[in-house]
A protein has these predicted regions:
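Solvent-exposed coil/turn segments that connect beta secondary-structure elements
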Residues: 19-21, 30-34, 44-47, 90-93, ...
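Flexible, solvent-exposed short loops/turns enriched in glycine
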Residues: 35-65, 109-120
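Entry/capping segment at the start of metal-dependent catalytic domains
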Residues: 1-41, 138
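Flexible, polar/acidic helix-loop-strand segments at domain edges
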Residues: 98-171
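Second-shell loop/turn segments in exported
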Residues: 54-64, 76-84, 141-150, 166
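Terminal domain-initiation and capping elements
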Residues: 1, 33, 45, 72-76
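Amphipathic, coiled-coil-like alpha-helical scaffolding segments used for oligomerization/assembly
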Residues: 63-122
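Envelope-exposed proteins and targeting segments
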Residues: 10-12, 21-26, 36-38, 81-84, ...
């Protein structure tokens, strides 16, 4: 069987969108030659150009969907022209992720000890189901006291934990 080694051209940037009352966004950059995935949590309140005005990314998503969000982000961030998007409902994402079991995750890099305690969590790495992770991220996003950057960092931490464990179960 002929095996090709990864090349520098084997790269992909994807905007991952989780729909709902409080949509969530993560940019994933897949780089085969470096054998890595880089994740960037994008705050839903990030201001982007929309309809000749400025609007929050979440408002852009609600009004025009993921393709328009990708276009708006390309005007704000230096994203590649071939950036793709993938949108999930929270139910579909939970169903897909739950097949891999609970993820082991630590939010200490994204949230302070006080912020974690406010939600009954600690700095310790803990097992959490896909449904509980989604509910926790929605709680964070609804918290007006918590900064959008911290919420985005927590979302990226959840995606990162998912990609890092049980890699043998992920489709190839």
């Amino acid at each position: 069987v002929h095996v090709q080694l990864p090349r520098t051209t084997d790269q992909l940037t994807v905007l991952l969108c989780v729909s709902g009352e409080q949509p969530g966004f993560v940019l994933a950059y897949l780089n085969a030659s470096q054998n890595c995935v880089h994740l960037l949590g994008v705050p839903a309140v990030l201001t982007v150009p929309f309809a000749d005005e400025q609007a929050a990314l979440a408002q852009c998503y609600a009004a025009a969907g993921p393709a328009r969000c990708r276009e708006a982000l390309m005007q704000v961030l230096a994203l590649p022209e071939d950036t793709r998007y993938l949108a999930f409902s929270s139910d579909v994402l939970e169903r897909i992720a739950s097949r891999y079991g609970p993820i082991r995750i630590g939010f200490s890099g994204a949230l302070t000890e006080d912020e974690l305690a406010r939600y009954g969590r600690s700095r310790a790495v803990q097992g959490i189901s896909a449904g509980d992770a989604h509910a926790f991220l929605c709680q964070l996003q609804a918290d007006a006291v918590l900064s959008p950057q911290r919420t985005a960092a927590a979302r990226a931490a959840a995606w990162d934990a998912f990609f890092r464990q049980n890699a043998e179960l992920l489709p190839t």
